Amino acid sequence: MFSFLLLIIYLSFISLGLPDALLGSAWPIMHEELKVPLSYSGSVYMLISCCTILSSLKSESLNRRFGTGKITAFSVLLTALAIFGFSMSRSFYMLLLFAIPYGLGAGSVDAALNHYVALHYSSRHMNWLHCMWGIGASIGPYIMGFVLQRGFSWSKGYLLIGILQSGLTFLLFLSLGLWKEKEDANGLAKGELHDGAEAHLEVETKERAETTPEAKTNSLMMDTESEEGKKAMSFREILRIPGAKECIASFFFYCAIEQTIGLWSGSFMVYSLRIDAKLAASLVALFYFGITFGRFLAGIFSAKWKDEELILGGISILFLGIVLLFPAGLSSGKQLFGMELRQVFVILSLLFMGLGCAPIYPAIIHSTPYNFGAENTSALIGKQMASAYIGSLSLPPVFGVLAKNFGTELFPFYAVVLGIAMLYMYKQLLKKTKEAKRKWKKPIVSDEA
């Protein structure tokens, strides 16, 4: 039973990634068939992202009311219907219409699953589950390419992904009883917290509520059945939790730097390093390979390393990757092992940046119960998901403006600035949560895997 539910969660993370890169891979053909400019893909992406942000912000109240199992099942159903809608779209405006349920479903399932896994499973599973997302994001474009190469329309690619999503939806509805068994009577998931963390959470929640007035204000008691205990926290209440603002900001800057690297590293290679455009497009894939493989490794290392150590280690490797971009610009024409030296630096840089990014996202999510208590986890993770999409949407275009006016040579410097901002916010998060936990006298959750 436990193993089957975990298998369902792994499949759910693969399904999260499946449609994410479909639009980008199919759009060169889609925009011609739909008779719209190439730039219109940005409108579809923006609408999906805005709906995702909206549903992420509402995820806590929905999760408390319906539970993780139902939210996941209905959200995947919603995304499956939206993908079927994409496959039937014969105009750009139909795409915009179906982008709304796609974004709403994606945001809800992302926040719900991350909340559930953070409470119920070890850091190993959190990293491997996000590795599954990377596999799904890689499989999606491959399926679309397979369909297109055999002479079928892009709509058949979406149809095939929709069928896969429908199969997962069926399994999710079959598994609703398993999710329900693991939900606490108060609507807060308890279940399989690793290494006795459940007991620590209950004891610590009570102690915090009895020690300081500030803690009493911020806590939602796990052992009460009152309506107040079940009520979703307001955004203002969340921000009053020590370290919450820094946690949300850390997520914002992390997702901004990941999206900036993925979006602009190719342009930096082409326009600043004079690398062939086709080769540059292939090299960008190394960054995502580094993220996927890095999360697999992080799952192994999490048996010995705490989430904090994984995050700080990842940030260090990320900075190493960024630093390798600087000598790449100074090594034009030089050779090493039959390759241009600048290409060697770029390959190493992209791999290190991917490996560095790998543990940060899942480890921040997984450490949320430890830093803020299980009763606040759903609220924090919903806001983390929203800040992730806002960071991905807002700061990469800022570099586009800078590149237009000052050149793509600014790319490594911009990445350094975002990295420093992320590191500063994360260090502030550690400082404030550790100060708060000293007031509470003992840790909230054992962070051992």
Regions found by a protein language model. Give the residues of each.
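Cytoplasmic helix-loop-helix junction between adjacent transmembrane helices
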Residues: 98-132
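Extracytoplasmic gate region of multi-pass secondary transporters
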Residues: 23-24, 241-285, 289
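A late C-terminal transmembrane helix in Major Facilitator Superfamily
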Residues: 371-408
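Helix-loop-helix hairpin linking two adjacent transmembrane segments in secondary transporters
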Residues: 129-183
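Helix-breaking motifs and short loop linkers at transmembrane-helix boundaries and internal kinks
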Residues: 35, 67, 88-93, 274, ...
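C-terminal transmembrane helical hairpin of 12-TM major facilitator-type secondary transporters
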Residues: 308-364
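Conserved MFS/SLC helix-loop-helix module at the cytosolic interface between two early adjacent transmembrane helices
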Residues: 54-93
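Helix-to-loop junctions at the C-terminal end of transmembrane segments
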Residues: 55-67, 294-307, 403-404
